[in-house]
Regions:
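N-terminal secretory signal peptides that target proteins for export/translocation
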Residues: 1-2
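Bacterial N-terminal signal peptides
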Residues: 5-15
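Active-site-adjacent structural segments surrounding the nucleophilic cysteine of cysteine proteases
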Residues: 15-115, 247, 260-261
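Short, well-ordered loop/turn elements at secondary-structure boundaries
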Residues: 37, 151-154, 198
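Generic hydrophobic, helix-prone segments enriched in Leu/Val/Ile
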Residues: 78-82, 138-150, 252-261
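Predominantly the structural core of cysteine protease catalytic domains
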Residues: 90-190
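Active-site signature of cysteine proteases
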Residues: 144, 161-261
């Protein structure tokens, strides 16, 4: 999907949502944690802090227990306390390193942060279409996860990946390859898909810069034919932009969610 198409889709969604019911994170007065104050690849730890901070009072306990008065101090504490532990899923590596952190290790960090405060377990789900599943069904499933987590007081964390259509030396042909991934936190969406079965609007916190933005999750995969993922139109996102080669087709996908349901 082109940037202009993404903008037009976002404008259209604003029109559709004029009468739609919205669900929001409980603590909308929270200030975003900015990963760039600490490490450029700290979106995982920063997103956990944002999810807990924007959540209900009981989830805020996990944020308030992290010492520090600024993004850098809090992020570094989360990394040193929980992120530098050995991964339970990949032998010989730490949970967080210079490449960032993966989804399952991030879940482990989240639950260890919660254990101290008697908070319920946080789950994750990789969102791919089953062989006979329609894209609209996957969209509905993803939306249900987001809404349920918001209702339970925890803004969910989404994994967004940028794919690029490029040559493979091994396969000697062009195919779609993931070139970058990023975590964002959803703080607002519609309660149902009744008026828009192919997309839903989101308001999210982007820890890369510490800002809130708007976008849409949709069933269109553009030129990424047979994509198993949902598409993401995030006009303000810079995910993987520096890795795109000149003239290369790229697209953003929504591949997984971390939350409470």
């Amino acid at each position: 999907m082109t940037s202009w198409a993404a903008i037009f889709l976002l404008i259209a969604m604003h029109t559709i949502l004029s009468g739609a019911e919205i669900i929001r994170a409980e603590n909308t007065n929270a200030s975003p944690t900015n990963q760039r104050r600490a490490h450029g690849n700290a979106c995982g730890p920063a997103s956990l802090l944002n999810a807990f901070h924007y959540g209900s009072k009981r989830w805020q306990r996990a944020f308030n227990a992290v010492p520090g008065d600024d993004s850098k101090t809090r992020i570094n504490y989360v990394i040193s306390r929980w992120g530098l532990k050995p991964s339970k899923h990949i032998e010989g590596v730490r949970r967080w390193n210079q490449q960032g952190i993966n989804l399952v290790d991030l879940q482990d960090v989240a639950n260890e942060m919660c254990d101290y405060h008697w908070l319920p377990k946080i789950k994750y789900e990789v969102l791919t279409r089953a062989p006979d599943e329609a894209a609209t069904t996957l969209l509905q499933r993803s939306h249900q996860r987001i809404v349920k987590s918001l209702k339970k007081g925890l803004p969910p964390i989404l994994c967004i990946r940028r794919y690029a259509y490029r040559n493979s030396k091994e396969l000697k042909t062009k195919s779609w390859w993931p070139i970058s991934a990023h975590f964002i936190v959803i703080i607002e969406t519609t309660t149902t898909l009744k008026n828009s079965p192919n997309s839903y609007r989101i308001k999210y916190v982007d820890s890369y810069g510490g800002h809130t933005h708007e976008g849409t999750i949709h069933t269109s995969s553009g030129s990424f034919t047979n994509s198993p993922f949902l598409g993401a139109s995030l006009p303000s996102a810079t995910i993987g932009n520096t890795l795109i080669k000149k003239g290369e087709a790229t697209t953003l996908t929504f591949s997984a969610v971390l939350g409470r349901w």
